[in-house]
């Protein structure tokens, strides 16, 4: 069985994720306690369920998640785990807009306190799967991103390469963060400013800069050196985030370059430009 487990912070988009999976042909179960997952899967497998997505409640059993995933994999199921999160200010705004109560606010906590408490409870499992920071994603952007994620072949490690602008904050879901603000900046050339790192004028400018090419070589070398190590550690996802000031030129160019080089070696790569996708 192809099995996708979904967890994360309240308000981070778990319901949207489940809807995307349902539209993609998965049978879906919402808000199932973690302790019931193994028995539920074993009961459904003989009935012909080939693709199952479960949004799990892990606040009371986070410490057992790795054990549950291992047991499911031992039973022959292909398991992927998605963890959705967002910045606190984003979550507060979403709860304000929807006028929903945070699940932990019933314990007399304010919304910021409830978010902080839930983040603490789930901290141990955030790194066990594919972390997805939804802070800067609209519902439609999140749907597109998730469709790209689930389209990847199960059983292979997915390398996510993301460009971003430091002025908009560092992505929460990055395993590696590279600061390339030290490189020559085409922004200061008025003729180049309107373009992005995917456009020929910027590509030509940055390709001609020795420091930029040295950075591209170093990033590629580091990625190629360490991806096999993470794969050997049974990681399903690995995220590289490359940041410049605004996320328009240098980081986009280097993310495109790194993605192309990794694809040439046979890696499964998902490329995302956070600021261009806004």
From Swiss-Prot:
The UniProt entry, under InterPro entries, shows: P-loop_NTPase, RapZ-like, RapZ-like_N, RapZ_C
Chain positions recorded as GTP binding sites:
57-60
Task: Name any one GO molecular function.
Answer: GTP binding
Provide this UniProt record's keywords sorted from A to Z.
ATP-binding, GTP-binding, Nucleotide-binding
Is DNA-binding set as a keyword in this record?
Answer: no
Instruction: Say which domain of life the source belongs to.
Output: Bacteria
Q: Where does ATP bind?
A: 8-15
Instruction: Return the PANTHER family for the record.
Output: RNASE ADAPTER PROTEIN RAPZ (PTHR30448:SF0)
User: Which family does the similarity line name?
Assistant: Belongs to the RapZ-like family.
What does this protein do, in the record's words? Answer: Displays ATPase and GTPase activities.
Q: What is this protein called?
A: Nucleotide-binding protein LHK_02029
Please give the organism: Laribacter hongkongensis (strain HLHK9)
